Amino acid sequence: MPRAAVVCGLGSYLPEAVLSNDMLAAELDTSDAWISSRTGVRQRHIAGDLGSGDLALRAASAALASAGLERVDAVVLATSTGDFCCPATAPRVAARLGLVGALAFDLSAACTGFVYGLASVGSLISAGLADSALLVGVDTFSHTLDPADRSTRALFGDGAGAVVLRAGDAEEEGALLAFDLGSDGHQFDLLMTPAVSRAERSSGQASNYFRMDGKAVFGQAVTQMSDSVRRVLDRVGWQASDLHHLVPHQANTRILAAVADQLDLPVERVVSNIAEVGNTVAASIPLALAHGLRQGILRDGGNMVLTGFGAGLTWGSVALRWPKIVPTMD
């Protein structure tokens, strides 16, 4: 039987500093009612002086503890806000974990990064290049935002979520069963951060800040995630009605509701934690998984699809049966 990548550990980390809607309203022309009605976000965590590598280290340590492992063969970071333009952040995180010699690299696919990362790690394991691997979705997007832009500051937060995967077979719970991945670079400018380094992003120059076309992004996000979920369901032989859990990128509550409606899926099957953490970019899916486990929402052995959409434009989905996991949070 061909080797498969099997999820066996989960960890998460959120910075201690919390920025509530009321706190944001004290700085900008906005209100809790305005923010929550448009995005569903009530608070977000802010990294401050911490970098993405710092957050990734904490989530990775928690995931390794959850899996009962001290070492893995590969470390992959899905991030758009690495500590440097060059070198990649993953090798430094691996070294801080005591994993010198491990294969390590960064992957940049914005809010789809965690799904792309699962495909990359799954391929490494399936090819026999690794028997175990750590994937961290992490972003410190607050470092990219214009302090005067209420639309982006209201939406985005910082955080990290990580999973450990090991070699196994496709019959096991937690095995990655099927993927759908895609992109459309013609629309690259709908979401973008022109700056390439943290220093540039923190320079105070408006041209370096993250920007997005919210109205255009809404339509693309709903269409691409819905279509991607349908394709991956077809590849694994499931119907939408067979799904126990849909775990989408936490873009905003309106997008999540629209995707559920497109799939004719009861909204209670959609896992969401956006109210507590905001849009955490590549960290959003693993943070939503950790939330679902802690809340007792996720069903062991339940049919699950993870789906993402982000800058690029990129999108992707993966199907699996959720394994029994003890989550840990640093």
UniProtKB/Swiss-Prot annotation:
Pathway terms, separated by semicolons: Lipid metabolism; fatty acid biosynthesis
NCBIfam families, per the entry: fabH, PRK09352.1
One of the Pfam families matching this protein, by short name: ACP_syn_III_C
Domain of life: Bacteria
Family per similarity comment: Belongs to the thiolase-like superfamily. FabH family.
Molecular-function GO terms, alphabetical: 3-oxoacyl-[acyl-carrier-protein] synthase activity; beta-ketoacyl-acyl-carrier-protein synthase III activity
Stored InterPro entries: ACP_syn_III_C, ACP_syn_III_N, FabH, Thiolase-like
HAMAP family per the UniProt record, alphabetical: FabH
Gene Ontology annotations of biological process type: fatty acid biosynthetic process; secondary metabolite biosynthetic process
Native source organism of the sequence: Pseudomonas aeruginosa (strain ATCC 15692 / DSM 22644 / CIP 104116 / JCM 14847 / LMG 12228 / 1C / PRS 101 / PAO1)
Protein name, as recorded: Beta-ketoacyl-[acyl-carrier-protein] synthase III
Keywords of the record: Acyltransferase, Cytoplasm, Fatty acid biosynthesis, Fatty acid metabolism, Lipid biosynthesis, Lipid metabolism, Multifunctional enzyme, Transferase
Oligomeric and partner information: Homodimer.
Active site: residue positions: C111, H249, N279
Record's comment describing the protein's domains: The last Arg residue of the ACP-binding site is essential for the weak association between ACP/AcpP and FabH.
Function in brief: Catalyzes the condensation reaction of fatty acid synthesis by the addition to an acyl acceptor of two carbons from malonyl-ACP. Catalyzes the first condensation reaction which initiates fatty acid synthesis and may therefore play a role in governing the total rate of fatty acid production. Possesses both acetoacetyl-ACP synthase and acetyl transacylase activities. Its substrate specificity determines the biosynthesis of branched-chain and/or straight-chain of fatty acids.
EC numbers on record: 2.3.1.180
Lineage of the species this protein comes from: Bacteria, Pseudomonadati, Pseudomonadota, Gammaproteobacteria, Pseudomonadales
Annotated segments matching region ACP-binding: 250-254
Compartments it resides in: Cytoplasm
Any one GO cellular component localisation term in the record: cytoplasm
Catalytic reactions of this protein: malonyl-[ACP] + acetyl-CoA + H(+) = 3-oxobutanoyl-[ACP] + CO2 + CoA
